[in-house]
């Protein structure tokens, strides 16, 4: 006789996750559930939902690193439970951050003696780094104005209209007027002469970008420095420069070592760089470096001792993980100058492959420059039939995430697509992307043209009345719908026609 018994609902170990009750209901969206669920079910359900995310390696919109060596992944996981602010408890982690600051400062040609410690701090990204640099400029300007008995209520900062949104955040959050140099067609970075013309006695600094988000172009920091030196001599001001090198800070020293953009220029007082971009670390690490101690006002530095020892701190947040700092140190010593140079050269070569492939199609204008961040920004030569947004949308069907966007003022009428070439974007992928873009263009060519539809839907019939006068008769909504249906039926029928074996 076979004995059997019913399995209780609590005996979940015998159930497949997909045979359990946990996949029969929707996941909580607003309130925490009353009851627990097995760890296997929680993992499987969340993992399944995450499958709908894009593939990070094919996310060509992002500058952020999406691949690191397995050895570094191990270091990250082994330190993921360390809180960086516990400096007394994790002194080696603090030492690694200080080493990173020193290495990056020397990379940017900071005027340091051989054993002198650099002034800088690790952040969660360039946005926080820019906030800190901006606060230092504002406080220095305020202190100088107060000493001169002048008002301090109207600080401003001069940037190009192509700056990343974090500059707008800084201006709004910390009550600084943002004075933007407008762009123009064919010139998508800040014009140094226009920027200097905007400078007045209330300008806390001029921000230059080494690697525009829009097209990767390096702004002419040296020309800006030279023009600003002359203006400072004429006016008696001492307006400084901050370089936003979020993208280009780990590129220029290796690909363009002779380019003067950093602390070699006397008015450059601080530089930020994203470790999680071309510093080759996963998201969550940035750096800001000051020229010397005098450029970071002491009153902005806090000293705390409730974690076991006196700790100076200058950050906008408090707790943060240590793993990204450790990963940055790994990359700096693992790759060295040789390794970073090889990576950046590979990125540039793959950028050239992609750019030349797009040029051969004769369908696109290349908006990006040869010298700059390794990316390709391009726009349609003829957008009367189809748009860059349609190309971006259709590329997702092949797995590619390629952003389309309009330029800032006064070039809003220009729309571009942008492909960022990262370390893990190989030549094979570049060639494959060109093939898929050509496929998309052929598919779009087969679609009813936007212009043709506009003409057909807005078409008007002309008829003669009894007095031989021409009377215009507009199509009804039903007629327009019939035209659309007829057009799509023809399109579908043509798509079904084949010649040979499918």
From Swiss-Prot:
<dbReference type="GO" id="GO:0060090">
    <property type="term" value="F:molecular adaptor activity"/>
</dbReference>
<feature type="modified residue" description="N6-(pyridoxal phosphate)lysine">
    <location>
        <position position="277"/>
    </location>
</feature>
<dbReference type="GO" id="GO:0030170">
    <property type="term" value="F:pyridoxal phosphate binding"/>
</dbReference>
<comment type="function">
    <text>Catalyzes the conversion of glutamate to 4-aminobutanoate (GABA). The calmodulin-binding is calcium-dependent and it is proposed to directly or indirectly form a calcium regulated control of GABA biosynthesis.</text>
</comment>
<keyword id="KW-0210">Decarboxylase</keyword>
<dbReference type="InterPro" id="IPR015421">
    <property type="entry name" value="PyrdxlP-dep_Trfase_major"/>
</dbReference>
<comment type="subunit">
    <text>Homohexamer. Interacts with calmodulin with a 1:3 stoichiometry.</text>
</comment>
<feature type="site" description="Anchoring site for calmodulin binding; modulates the equilibrium between pyridoxal phosphate tautomers">
    <location>
        <position position="496"/>
    </location>
</feature>
<keyword id="KW-0663">Pyridoxal phosphate</keyword>
<dbReference type="GO" id="GO:0005516">
    <property type="term" value="F:calmodulin binding"/>
</dbReference>
<feature type="region of interest" description="Calmodulin-binding">
    <location>
        <begin position="469"/>
        <end position="502"/>
    </location>
</feature>
<feature type="site" description="Anchoring site for calmodulin binding; modulates the equilibrium between pyridoxal phosphate tautomers">
    <location>
        <position position="497"/>
    </location>
</feature>
<dbReference type="InterPro" id="IPR010107">
    <property type="entry name" value="Glutamate_decarboxylase"/>
</dbReference>
<feature type="modified residue" description="Phosphoserine">
    <location>
        <position position="8"/>
    </location>
</feature>
<dbReference type="InterPro" id="IPR002129">
    <property type="entry name" value="PyrdxlP-dep_de-COase"/>
</dbReference>
<keyword id="KW-0456">Lyase</keyword>
<keyword id="KW-0112">Calmodulin-binding</keyword>
<dbReference type="InterPro" id="IPR015424">
    <property type="entry name" value="PyrdxlP-dep_Trfase"/>
</dbReference>
<keyword id="KW-0597">Phosphoprotein</keyword>
<protein>
    <recommendedName>
        <fullName>Glutamate decarboxylase 1</fullName>
        <ecNumber>4.1.1.15</ecNumber>
    </recommendedName>
</protein>
<dbReference type="GO" id="GO:0006536">
    <property type="term" value="P:glutamate metabolic process"/>
</dbReference>
<dbReference type="GO" id="GO:0004351">
    <property type="term" value="F:glutamate decarboxylase activity"/>
</dbReference>
<comment type="similarity">
    <text>Belongs to the group II decarboxylase family.</text>
</comment>
<dbReference type="Pfam" id="PF00282">
    <property type="entry name" value="Pyridoxal_deC"/>
</dbReference>
